[in-house]
């Protein structure tokens, strides 16, 4: 995927607030705080500062939308599950995240991020179950594989895939540091965009 056009469209702070008027399919990226989402997006888009990398996890409070190649809209969702964020703040974010994922008429697919070094948290499982209930096609990007030795990373990816009941084509090992998995993830996005509307498929 060659990035010829990348334009920030704006933020959505509440489920009934502003959202892009552009009628392109949307791909959402979601993961717990500190999973490496900003670094992954920067590498995927081949930009050093496309998504701001914060030193304080849990800072992002809005959904940020970007026009990619006039082909699709990338939705960068707030990180979930950061322990130091107050319960009140989490209570504000959950309706935004779940409301968007459950009601966006143009959502074509979701990429959920997991850190290869850690077992999925309860928040991760809750998100997976929610996405499964909604029925939206989902890819799991397993991040930070460069933090382990290659053999360890492969074994860990296989272990996580089996534990989560994921097929090989649903999982993309990724390193924002080395760029490993960048082309595979870009290809997975194109496959999501080429799929028929999953809502129509569900109705049938």
UniProtKB/Swiss-Prot annotation:
Gene3D superfamilies recorded: P-loop containing nucleotide triphosphate hydrolases
PROSITE patterns noted in UniProt: G_ENGB
GO molecular function: GTP binding; metal ion binding
One biological process term in Gene Ontology: division septum assembly
Residue ranges of domain EngB-type G in the record: 23-195
Record key words, sorted: Cell cycle, Cell division, GTP-binding, Magnesium, Metal-binding, Nucleotide-binding, Septation
InterPro entries per UniProt: G_ENGB_dom (IPR030393), GTP-bd (IPR006073), GTP-bd_ribosome_bio_YsxC (IPR019987), P-loop_NTPase (IPR027417), Small_GTP-bd (IPR005225)
Residues reported to bind Mg(2+): 38, 60
Binding residues annotated for GTP, in chain numbering: 31-38, 58-62, 76-79, 143-146, 174-176
Essential cofactor(s): Mg(2+)
Endoplasmic reticulum as UniProt keyword: no
NCBIfam families in UniProt: GTPase_YsxC, small_GTP
Function comment: Necessary for normal cell division and for the maintenance of normal septation.
Family membership noted in the UniProt record: Belongs to the TRAFAC class TrmE-Era-EngA-EngB-Septin-like GTPase superfamily. EngB GTPase family.
Protein name as catalogued: Probable GTP-binding protein EngB
Species this chain originates from: Gemmatimonas aurantiaca (strain DSM 14586 / JCM 11422 / NBRC 100505 / T-27)
